Amino acid sequence: MIKVLCLDYDNTVFDHRAGKIPESAEKALEAVRGKCRIVLASGRFFNDVWNAPIKELIKPDGIIHSNGSMVEAEGLVLKETFLDPKLQKEVLDFAYTHELCLGGLYEGKWYTTNPEKQLSRWKGKEQLFRRELHDAGMLYEIPMHALSLDDTVEAARLIAENFPGLRTPLMNEITGGADVIPSYLSKAYGLTLLLKHWGLGFAETAAVGDSMNDLEMIQAAGVGIAMGNGVSALKEAADFVTADISEDGLKRALEYLELLS
């Protein structure tokens, strides 16, 4: 029996192409509520003013923020981890030197090493243009849970190759984009902490995701499901591949888990 349902957010629950959560996904989540614990697992930090409304919308029992850098159960913080300050400065300097687009969100403001590239990468996401861009150099002295690389696949590899203490799980195997996190963190790490807190095991869990930051979580869960719009490596690792998010993918995943019957 599935007692914990662990869900990625971007392009698993929220369809970026449509700019909304599919109606079928909304109804499916409401139908599941109360049948098992819902965990929201993302590269996002949901306590920031930009992302807090998502937390209120989904109302999860547990949250794995920033790929495991902060883990909450019913509002109780179980663990919080920040990037090493020296390593954080070094990777930001590296991004400036190589003209990479690296940055992150802090207290509702977006910081970047490359404003021009950031605006280009955000093209078609007009809702983000309302956010003023700030110099990522201001992040040197700010504790960050993670950084966001909005750049190519090659850029992600470049950082991973030069910083063994960091890893850069890809969001998309064609357009790139990656989270920049400590090498030991993952959503699976966060799920481990939640299960220990709840006194449950991985065999009682299911996980659904679409990108490489979901890989360890998909592999660790009792049942791992990849979205039809997910990256190929995740689909290969999954126990089941559901439909594309725009084709009722999340609903079909929950049907497969027999959570909607």
PLM segments and residue spans:
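Asp-based phosphoryl-transfer active-site loop
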Residues: 3-18
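Hydrophobic/aromatic beta-strand patches that form the interior of the parallel beta-sheet core
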Residues: 39, 64, 206-208, 225, ...
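Conserved acidic, metal-coordinating active-site core of Asp-based
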Residues: 94, 98-101, 105-220, 229
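Hydrophobic "anchor" residues on beta-strands that sit immediately upstream
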Residues: 4-6, 62, 200, 206, ...
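Short, well-ordered alpha-helix to beta-strand connector turns
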Residues: 2, 35-36, 60, 143-144, ...
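Asp-based, Mg2+/Mn2+-dependent phosphohydrolase catalytic module
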Residues: 201, 220, 225-261
